[in-house]
Amino acid sequence: MIEIKSVNKVFYQGDKQIHALKDINLFIPQGTIFGVIGSSGAGKSTLIRCVNMLEKPTSGQVIVDGVDLTTLSNPQLCAARRNIGMIFQHFNLLSSRTVFENVALPLELAGQSQQHIETKVTELLALVGLSEKRESYPANLSGGQKQRVAIARALASDPKVLLCDEATSALDPATTQSILELLKEINRQLNLTILLITHEMDVVKSICHEVAIIGGGELVEKGTVGDIFAHPKTELAHQFIRSTLDLSIPEDYQVRLQPTRVAGSYPLVRLEFTGATVDAPLMTQIARKYNIDVSILSSDLDYAGGVKFGMMVAEIFGNADDDEAAIRYLRENNVKVEVLGYVL
């Protein structure tokens, strides 16, 4: 459905070149919810704007439903964009128009009949759960309701693709979840291909089938959500996975942490478990095998793409050789171990 082939985007500031995208290659199948995640400035918003030619790539191809958008004239591109809906972090509703009139706007601009507009908008407002708000104005809506109006408006032309650029970033957690559930339902009902840009791994975990991770304008890693969470290959992937599990070090431990081992200290470790390692009794194994004690300060477990993953912060009590042997054993069994320091 969407093919991004060797896409590069360069911005110019005087004599300075800024490479926002570097040789990006992605394929997004029909009916997929595909997430692109990256930190601020990674290039993800530039990428999504290239998909509908709001930003024209410096080089490369963007093929949507078999049509290479980079080769189209302006009138042809305008017609092709009717197959691509888009929603943003900010809702961009017209304050002087009612909910009904905001959703109807693309249909009016396309020259549709009043009968078609009435039928279509009524159907869309029912889909997004806003039938009773049709005569309300944006000022009287919550943030979540405004985003629902924006979604209905984006679907007015029956697009085959919906682009979501940080669509939940301005919403509270409960409202974010309701919007994500709505997008999942729309994907199921309409078989709509959704390309979703976010900096939050929780959003990817909740809704996406596949994900690509972008850093510094480059494609760092891609795959199914289950594969990325079960077998992250890069440090950036580990960082985003870690962000979904909030395991901070207690303050009293932070002040006692030493960078190197000294007499009377013991290691404080952060362990990341993915895939099969989540269910393996590794902590009891190392306790018995190496004659050490393990004190778990905090732990968390979650699911993404049908795969369990978890994290733990723990203290290891033993002599230096046994501690190191236990850490090696965990790493040999595909547990990512980070020694945070040594508690004195």
Curated annotation (Swiss-Prot):
Origin: domain of life: Bacteria
Primary subcellular site in the record, as a coarse category: membrane
Keywords: Amino-acid transport, ATP-binding, Cell inner membrane, Cell membrane, Membrane, Nucleotide-binding, Translocase, Transport
Chain coiled-coil ranges: none
Pfam families, per the entry: ABC_tran, NIL
Topology term for the membrane: Peripheral membrane protein
Keyword Membrane: yes
EC number(s) per entry: 7.4.2.11
Transmembrane segments: none
GO cellular component: Gram-negative-bacterium-type cell wall; plasma membrane
Known partners and oligomeric status: The complex is composed of two ATP-binding proteins (MetN), two transmembrane proteins (MetI) and a solute-binding protein (MetQ).
PANTHER family listed in its UniProt record: AMINO ACID IMPORT ATP-BINDING PROTEIN, METHIONINE IMPORT ATP-BINDING PROTEIN METN
NCBIfam families recorded: ABC_MetN
Function of the molecule: Part of the ABC transporter complex MetNIQ involved in methionine import. Responsible for energy coupling to the transport system.
Name by which UniProt lists this protein: Methionine import ATP-binding protein MetN
Source organism of this protein record: Vibrio cholerae serotype O1 (strain ATCC 39315 / El Tor Inaba N16961)
Source organism phylogeny: Bacteria, Pseudomonadati, Pseudomonadota, Gammaproteobacteria, Vibrionales
